[in-house]
Amino acid sequence: MKTAIFTVVLALAVFAVLSFGWEANEKALSEEFTELIHEKEAASETEARECRYFWGECHDRMPCCDWLVCRYKWPITYNICVWNRTFPEK
């Protein structure tokens, strides 16, 4: 009976140690993933376009490109960039 209790206690101790190691590994992976997301976010902000292209949503902070104009078009409920019938200069 003593060996059975000792075996159960030993097994619980082993499971506790393994569980602690798994949690530490999971937390490290979570932190690494968060850092990766922040790096990708920063990279996408630097690659932001200077103007909105055709059918893109437009507003004061993000105007349309030179050959487009910002207009309200039904049934779309926001302003979009549409062609102003000119061609961009190259």
Curated annotation (Swiss-Prot):
InterPro entries to which the protein is assigned, alphabetical: Huwentoxin-1 (IPR011696)
SUPFAM superfamilies in alphabetical order: omega toxin-like (SSF57059)
Keywords for the protein's UniProt record, in alphabetical order: Disulfide bond, Ion channel impairing toxin, Knottin, Secreted, Signal, Toxin
Assigned GO CC terms: extracellular region
Domain of life: Eukaryota
Cleavable signal peptide: 1-19
Pfam families found in the cross-reference section: Toxin_12
Disulfide bonds: 51-65, 58-70, 64-81
Propeptide stretch(es), residue numbers: 20-50
Tissues expressed in: Expressed by the venom gland.
One Gene Ontology term of the molecular function aspect: ion channel inhibitor activity
Subcellular location: Secreted
Family: Belongs to the neurotoxin 10 (Hwtx-1) family. 13 (Hntx-13) subfamily.
Function: Ion channel inhibitor.
UniProt domain comment: The presence of a 'disulfide through disulfide knot' structurally defines this protein as a knottin.
This protein's name: U7-theraphotoxin-Hhn1e
